[in-house]
Amino acid sequence: MLRALLLSLTLITGLAQANTTQQSPISLDTDQGTLYGSLLVPQSDKPVPVALLIAGSGPTDRNGNNPEGGHNDALKKLAQVLARNGIASLRYDKRGVAASRAATPDEKDLSVERYVADVEGWAKLLRDDPRFDRLILIGHSEGALISSLAAPASQADALVSIAGPAYPVGQVLDMQLAMRLPPPLLAESRHMARCISST
């Protein structure tokens, strides 16, 4: 009996949520191609806050999934929780990833500056939408760094850093490379970093 009640409540809650939120595809045209995302908006008669979700490093898609780190839908789940609490959200595939792959198919053409410009472009799109009254940037890991760089030009009302770097970017890169590179390449990488920092 208890199982049937819990199952019924779960189904009703799911249906209620489906009726109170609307998910739609959204896109942003950039100078290198189109970026694609998902916009989740709670039903409301007045403007609501909107969160722009920025994924971390690597080939992480709009839902927070990375072929190197597994499938967990972390950003999708965050968007759903935000919607249940009256906050809209936009999550997107970064350039070079998933549906946005064609925007920058070659990894060597990716840069922090391009990622920042992308956040600023999405932010403008959201600020210009009358359904939204406040803009929140929520970045995970590298996305937290990108968010902090884009916040001033994006005119963000708030910034949330989830597992953002707490060390200087050079030290973060060194720690990440130390886990992946063989010793000779790591030594060469550290030598190049010292040369760059001394100029």
Whereabouts are the PLM-identified features?
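Alpha/beta-hydrolase fold nucleophile elbow
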Residues: 129-141
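Short glycine-enriched nucleophile-adjacent loop
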Residues: 144-154
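Short, surface-exposed "cap/lid" segments of acyl-processing enzymes
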Residues: 44-82
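Accessory cap/linker subdomain of secreted extracellular hydrolases
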Residues: 162-199
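Alpha/beta-hydrolase active-site loop
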Residues: 74, 107-128
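Conserved alpha/beta-hydrolase
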Residues: 73-101
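N-terminal cap/lid segment of alpha/beta-hydrolase-fold proteins
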Residues: 19-46
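Residue in the alpha/beta-hydrolase core beta-strand immediately N-terminal to the catalytic nucleophile
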Residues: 136, 158-160
